[in-house]
Swiss-Prot record:
GO terms for MF: catalase activity; cobalt ion binding; heme binding
Cellular compartment(s): Cytoplasm, Cytosol; Peroxisome matrix
EC number(s) from the headed UniProt entry: 1.11.1.6
The name this protein goes by in its record: Catalase-2
Gene Ontology BP annotations: cell death; cell redox homeostasis; cellular response to nitrogen starvation; cellular response to phosphate starvation; cellular response to sulfate starvation; hydrogen peroxide catabolic process; photoperiodism; response to cold
Lineage, top ranks: Eukaryota, Viridiplantae, Streptophyta, Embryophyta, Tracheophyta
Source species: Arabidopsis thaliana
Cofactor(s) of this protein: heme
Length: 492
């Protein structure tokens, strides 16, 4: 018998039931009892093992992005950007890289409807020849806050009330009344695009500012954008109620059925670029995640296309155990000093270790598809077969060496240790500009959603006044309409 052939995989299933240790099970229907009506015996190991495994089938759900669906496919470079990055998977047009993508809602639980007004996660794992690259983003190009210090409080405010387990507007609007930088995100969330029709008809964005580095070591700030070839479609409230009332997993089913039918969803990848030498030339901070970069002066540059042409084989193994982290990058791509990105670099890996264990990157869906080597040994659920005698570095008995050095962004850091906000907040200009691009009918729906939210009986006059003041600073007519309908005088 080849001991390596039968490593755990369903392809090696025996024709009969066995225990976890491989012993044959001749009766998988009845417990072992004393006589036909007597007590069950503790020595019924098969029963105990079966129940114990069942009791442990569930793992902690993600604290955010719990509800999601995944699919596999490929990314293909269509345009040469080798002048901007030395990333191997972007080296030339025609290069294809396997990917797995997870779409998700953000705040609500694993079994919640996919028709709730909520941002959508859009996370892509590239299995490159130089290791994995995780581009972990959302469907909106901006975020609520710009500093990760606020992230736990933000999620607590958006999550259900800890006393009643009910999501309530007064908690959300109380928290964000302290954070006017959230206005831009709300012009997306409370807009008509706040409920995507499904995952196929949805934009994607890397949200944070990253850096691209070319072979010469020249670095550029970069933003990543996914555009669906089938267009963006959304649900208005009435449609969401109808669709969600019929099938609370409609987006998951749409993705699965479309791929199964050969109707493969496709997205084009675009980037925006800023030379760090020019970062002070704008009226916003390029590292501020609450801002978009204006496309009229920073145009979208095409890079490639992503096609999802294969459904996952097992939901638990390739969706629940699928783990993303913005820290997972490859040569030619690096982090910027975006405050939210810097905190995500730690937090995502940390939550995966809590949820899946310290060896979560050994799980097949998370493991790199290229050769890899390190001395990270042992720990809970370490199932990698290793026969080395040397588990340290350096050693004259193990010829492993350092990889060839690759360019990283040049950076000179100086300054005082301090906790402070960025200088260019500019919280109101962009939300106002975006609101003014809406048609009158779309503006009216946006206003009505805010009327509904601010009409929560637990929202105080002070909080209503703050929000009307914020929206008045973004657009005077918007603030006036809200104030009139809520019978509140704006105070700027």
């Amino acid at each position: 018998m080849d001991p390596y052939k039968y490593r755990p995989a369903s392809s090696y299933n025996s024709p009969f039931f066995t225990t976890n240790s491989g012993a044959p099970v001749w009766n998988n229907n009845s417990s072992m009892t004393v006589g036909p009506r007597g007590p069950i015996l503790l020595e019924d190991y098969h029963l105990v093992e079966k129940l114990a495994n069942f009791d442990r089938e569930r793992i902690p759900e993600r604290v955010v992005h719990a509800r999601g669906a995944s699919a596999k496919g490929f990314f293909e470079v269509t345009h040469d950007i080798s002048n901007l990055t030395c990333a191997d998977f972007l080296r030339a047009p025609g290069v294809q890289t396997p990917v797995i993508v997870r779409f998700s809602t953000v705040i609500h639980e694993r079994g919640s409807p996919e028709t709730l007004r909520d941002p959508r996660g859009f996370a892509v794992k590239f299995y490159t020849r130089e290791g994995n690259f995780d581009l972990v983003g959302n469907n909106f190009p901006v975020f609520f806050i710009r500093d990760g210090m606020k992230f736990p409080d933000m999620v607590h405010a958006l999550k259900p009330n800890p006393k009643s387990h009910i999501q309530e507007n007064w908690r959300i609007l109380d928290f964000f009344s302290h954070h006017p930088e959230s206005l831009n995100m709300f012009t997306f969330l409370f807009d008509d695009i706040g409920i995507p029709q499904d995952y196929r008809h949805m934009d994607g964005s890397g949200v944070n500012t990253y850096m691209l580095i070319n072979k010469a070591g020249k670095a550029h700030y970069v933003k990543f954008h996914w555009k669906p070839t089938c267009g963006v479609k959304s649900l208005l409230e009435e449609d969401a109620i109808r669709v969600g009332g019929t099938n609370h997993s409609h987006a998951t089913q749409d993705l699965y059925d479309s791929i199964a039918a050969g109707n493969y969803p496709e997205w084009k990848l675009f980037i925006q670029i800023i030379d760090p030498a020019d970062e002070d030339k704008f009226d916003f901070d390029p590292l501020d995640v609450t801002k978009t970069w204006p496309e009229d002066i920073l145009p979208l540059q095409p890079v490639g296309r992503m096609v999802l042409n294969k459904n996952i084989d097992n939901f638990f193994a390739e969706n629940e155990q699928l783990a993303f982290c913005p820290a997972i990058i490859v040569p030619g791509i690096h982090y910027s000093d975006d405050k939210l990105l810097q905190t995500r670099v730690f937090s995502y890996a940390d939550t995966q270790r809590h949820r899946l264990g310290p060896n979560y990157l050994q799980l097949p869906v998370n493991a790199p598809k290229c050769a890899h080597h390190n001395n990270h040994h042992e720990g809970f659920m370490n199932f990698m077969h290793r026969d080395e005698e040397v588990n340290y570095f350096p050693s004259r008995y193990d010829q492993v060496r350092h990889a060839e050095k690759y360019p990283t962004p040049p950076a000179v850091c100086s300054g005082k240790r301090e906790r402070c906000i960025i200088e260019k907040e500019n919280n109101f200009k962009e939300p106002g500009e975006r609101y003014r691009t809406f048609t009158p009918e779309r503006q009216e729906r946006f206003i009505q959603r805010w009327i509904d939210a601010l009409s929560d009986p637990r929202i105080t006059h002070e909080i209503r006044s703050i929000w009307i003041s914020y929206w008045s600073q973004a657009d005077k007519s918007l603030g006036q309409k809200l104030a009139s309908r809520l019978n509140v005088r704006p105070s700027i």
